[in-house]
Design a protein with these regions (language model features):
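N-terminal low-hydrophobic presequence detector
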Residues: 1-2, 40
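Phosphate- and other anionic-substrate recognition elements at nucleic-acid/protein interfaces
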Residues: 28-234
Length: 234
């Protein structure tokens, strides 16, 4: 039996078995479901938001909650590694172009250089970068002000009635405006001790700003590279 080989043209099946290039590129390309997949990640030790955008469409907005069940940050990083490995493995055959975008470390917060913050987030970033590297996914970082300006349209704080930090509200508001409000809602347990919340049909909720941020980061990474200030991380 012969087949078309993208490297050596027509080859018989026996030749394929001897070939070191086990993956027939042309056949694999035909099997790919999407032209481009972007994974946006808003990383923190409280919650890490993760969004998948495929061919310009938001496919999934989710998050990893680190607030309970972990003794220290090392356990959180290891758990994140496991989750990312499963995610990255699940999409590897769905596109030839998969990139990961994380939020760039802010060296200064309100004018101060927070060394402990930089070290802890740097360690978290290394987990994400190494996980992406394992699957040969290019990984980029997005400046907070850049993605907010390009996707949300503003980074100016806005007051709101939902007890959301004014700095976070523009992003929440934007995600709601594009039809993904339900994806960034956090339903609170009945016995919750949280004092600030809002209600929908008698149920208590908060907005998940980490999930919202990850969505905007993914949408920013989906733009043509020359329209962004993305920086490749290695």
């Amino acid at each position: 039996m012969s087949k078309y080989c993208p490297l050596y043209e027509i080859a018989i099946y026996a030749d394929c078995l001897e070939c070191e290039n086990k993956i027939c590129k042309k056949e694999m390309e035909n099997k790919m479901k999407y032209n481009k997949i972007v994974i946006g990640i808003d990383q923190s030790y409280k919650r890490t938001g993760i969004t998948i955008v495929a061919d310009d469409k938001i496919k999934k907005i989710t998050f990893i909650d680190f607030q309970k069940g972990f003794a220290n940050n090392s356990e959180k990083r290891e758990y994140l590694r496991e989750k990312l490995d499963k995610l990255f493995a699940s999409i590897k055959d769905k596109s030839n172009k998969i990139i990961v975008v994380i939020e760039r470390i802010r060296l200064r917060s309100e004018g101060f250089l927070n060394i402990n913050y930089i070290k802890s987030i740097g360690a978290l970033n290394s987990i994400i970068i190494d996980s992406a590297y394992k699957y040969n996914y290019p990984i980029y970082s997005a400046d907070t002000r850049a993605w907010k300006s390009k996707i949300v349209g503003t980074s100016k704080p806005q007051n709101n009635k939902y007890f959301v930090d004014p700095k976070k509200w523009p992003t929440i508001k934007y995600i709601c405006s594009i039809g993904h409000k339900k994806d960034i809602l956090l339903k609170l347990p009945e016995n919750t001790k949280v004092k600030k919340y809002f209600e929908i049909d008698g149920e208590k909720y908060l907005f998940n700003d980490d999930a919202a941020d990850s969505c905007c980061i993914a949408l920013y990474g989906n733009l043509p590279l020359n329209q962004t200030t993305l920086k490749e991380e290695k």
